[in-house]
């Protein structure tokens, strides 16, 4: 009966890995940089539901300078309200600045991801390690 117990335990572990877990907080890339892509992962506050990436460019500049802001946020609307404030709108409407806001809801989705954080990668690793034992146990 031990092989059946191992099989049940393996299936239970697999189910835990494949089900979304609200217990951990969202992780986002966090930085404010000019012409760089080096950001650090940051665990967001429980009230933050999105990762945001904001790119501010000067379309008239021949140097193509830009500023990149990556952060945790409570909503994409909040980020847009912040970056499209009355102060910046004058520059945006006159064509001096261009602001692009992108939001997403998965860990580290606003920048380079960290290897091995995907639940599918974890599930695949579990199947590769437990698969032979489950097959050996048989029905």
UniProtKB/Swiss-Prot annotation:
GO terms for molecular function: acetylcholine receptor binding; acetylcholine receptor inhibitor activity. Interacts with CHRNA4 and CHRNA7. Disulfide bonds join 28-51, 31-39, 44-72, 76-103, 104-109. Believed to act as modulator of nicotinic acetylcholine receptors (nAChRs) activity. In vitro inhibits alpha-3:beta-4-containing nAChRs maximum response. In vitro inhibits alpha-3:beta-4-containing nAChRs maximum response. May play a role in the intracellular trafficking of alpha-7-containing nAChRs and may inhibit their expression at the cell surface. Seems to inhibit alpha-7/CHRNA7 signaling in hippocampal neurons. Strongly expressed in brain, also found in lower levels in eye and reproductive tissues. One of its GO terms (biological process) is acetylcholine receptor signaling pathway. Keywords: Cell membrane, Disulfide bond, Glycoprotein, GPI-anchor, Lipoprotein, Membrane, Signal. Residues 111-139 form a propeptide. The lineage of its organism: Eukaryota, Metazoa, Chordata, Craniata, Vertebrata. Glycans are attached at residue 35. This is Lymphocyte antigen 6H. One of its GO terms (cellular component) is synapse. It is a lipid-anchor; GPI-anchor. Residues 1-25 form the signal peptide. The gene is Ly6h. Residues 26-113 form the UPAR/Ly6 domain. Its main location: membrane.
